[in-house]
């Protein structure tokens, strides 16, 4: 079975959140036979989950950590070797190659569709930073 993680770029990290992720992942491995974890990027939640799953991998070495890229369809061996220090495999789904600016959204949709279990981090009080005004879109 496959699990994935989706969450805000910025999170309010705490020991409680880390412990909740750890217990959830252990339960999925031990009770639901989840053995593959898909990760995205550009998210503090992804980073925390990768760190937690990597720690658990020391106890459950059969699990796999897969980095699903949203950019760089073709990577050289040096970059791949770098990624494989943290993950067991990496790839970019076919449908993402032509997604343009929506590549990260398309990647997340792909991971949700591919997974049997999705672990979400959602903070209803989270407000993403405002984008700066551009030449054609001025603030008033």
Protein language model regions, located:
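Acidic/glycine-enriched connector segments
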Residues: 1-140
């Amino acid at each position: 079975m496959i699990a994935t993680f989706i969450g805000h770029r910025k999170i309010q990290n705490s020991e409680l959140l880390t412990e909740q992720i750890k217990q959830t992942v252990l339960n999925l491995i031990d009770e639901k036979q989840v053995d593959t974890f898909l990760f995205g990027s550009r998210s503090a939640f992804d980073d925390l989950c990768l760190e937690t799953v990597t720690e658990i991998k020391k106890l459950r070495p059969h699990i796999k950590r897969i980095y699903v890229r949203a950019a760089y369809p073709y990577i050289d061996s040096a970059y791949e070797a770098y990624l494989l220090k943290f993950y067991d495999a990496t790839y970019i789904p076919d449908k993402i190659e032509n997604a343009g600016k929506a590549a990260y959204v398309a990647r997340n949709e792909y991971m949700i569709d591919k997974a049997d279990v999705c672990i979400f981090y959602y903070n209803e009080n989270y407000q993403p930073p405002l984008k700066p005004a551009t030449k054609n879109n001025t603030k008033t």
